[in-house]
Amino acid sequence: ARLFRNYPHMELFSHVVGHIGRISDRDMAKLEEDELLANYRGTDHIGKQGLEQSYEKQLHGTTGFEQVETDAGGRAVRTLSRTPPISGNTLYLSIDSKLQALAIKAFGKYRGALVAIEPKTGEVLAFVSQPGFDPNLFVDGIDTANWEAYSNSPDKPLNNRALRGQYPPGSTFKPFMAMAALELNKRSPSYTISDPGYYTLPGSSHHYRDWKAGGHGSVDLHKSIVISCDTYYYGLAVDMGIDAIASF
């Protein structure tokens, strides 16, 4: 009997856990290069994506083997030696399964990515790329129909948007700008601006507008984050300069 991975949650963690698959010639060449080939057989499975791939060395364990004496007909007569296999390590994640499911439900029919992090520890609580896929289909080789359905889908379910997608950071960058301003003494918590709803560069009449027409009025550092005040950070960016911003 042989054991295979089963992914009972299917799409829920597909882009986090990834999947295993049949070992390929390319995998074998990489294992040989890393001096790990002796621990694998040509019929083994190996991590192909996600954490399955990243932690393959820790999860795989040690392959066992038997040395058997056979007769002229190839039938086993006796076992000369046996080395039992050693199970791989158990990997525990910080992902909150309920939060993960809630995040996926919130996306509904829409595509997108979401990563939720515990600020105090840096632990990843949710890691979502929508839509997902069924990793069970890849374990023993995905069939042509399912592969074409995934590959040709306009929703690109095999694309890990949370990991490989390139998106403008938008307002998620504002708290980091605020921390940089405090560290560089460019702003104090009590520093306040009067926001008319736009910002003009020195010597220019062009209006760089805030998301809220008419502005937010009096805005200090704390309020600038709470209401996501664009004009506050336009001015801060000018005062800090590109080199200081890039260092953060």
Show which residues each predicted segment covers.
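Conserved catalytic neighborhood of penicillin-recognizing serine enzymes
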Residues: 89-90, 157-162, 188-190, 194-246
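Short, glycine-/Ser/Thr-/acidic-enriched flexible segments
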Residues: 4, 21, 98, 121, ...
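Extracytoplasmic/periplasmic proteins that interact with beta-lactams or build/remodel peptidoglycan
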Residues: 1-113, 128, 132-161, 166
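Residue-level signal for well-ordered, solvent-exposed loop/turn and beta-edge residues enriched
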Residues: 75, 122-123
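Active-site SXXK
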Residues: 16, 102-106, 121-122, 166-193, ...
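Short hydrophobic alpha-helical segments used for membrane anchoring or interfacial signaling
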Residues: 114-119
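Stable alpha-helical elements in mature extracytoplasmic
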Residues: 12, 47, 51, 55, ...
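Short acidic, glycine/serine/threonine-rich loops at helix termini
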Residues: 126-129, 204
